[in-house]
Amino acid sequence: MTIRTEKVASLLQKELSAIFEKELPRSGPLMTVVQVKVTTDLGIARVYVSIIGSEKERKTAIAHLQNETRYIRKLLSAKIRHQFRRIPELEFYEDRLYEKAERIDLLIKQALGTSK
């Protein structure tokens, strides 16, 4: 990533985190913006969201985010419209890194426990 795309991604992550915290209704599981990746033409922003909840809640939350993309983009536009000519399209993805880390930790503990 270039310096510009990194700066844009960082700004988008900060602003989207604020939107998730303050402006979106909290009816489902806890969601946090983990990472934002922006294409080199700044046209698409891939937003990785960590969702704490059951499998069904996570799927519902991602579907809800994908349905509300236009609304979230409108809120984002109100915050950063003076810094960009064009607000990037948003694509939401579930970040499962925390879940994978827990699984690896459990496997390591099991392996150490059985080797004694």
From Swiss-Prot:
Protein localization: Cytoplasm
Annotated GO CC locations: cytosol
Protein name: Ribosome-binding factor A
Major site of localization recorded for this protein: cytoplasm
Signal peptide feature range: none
GO BP field: maturation of SSU-rRNA
Gene Ontology molecular function, alphabetical: ribosomal small subunit binding
Entry function: One of several proteins that assist in the late maturation steps of the functional core of the 30S ribosomal subunit. Associates with free 30S ribosomal subunits (but not with 30S subunits that are part of 70S ribosomes or polysomes). Required for efficient processing of 16S rRNA. May interact with the 5'-terminal helix region of 16S rRNA.
HAMAP family: RbfA
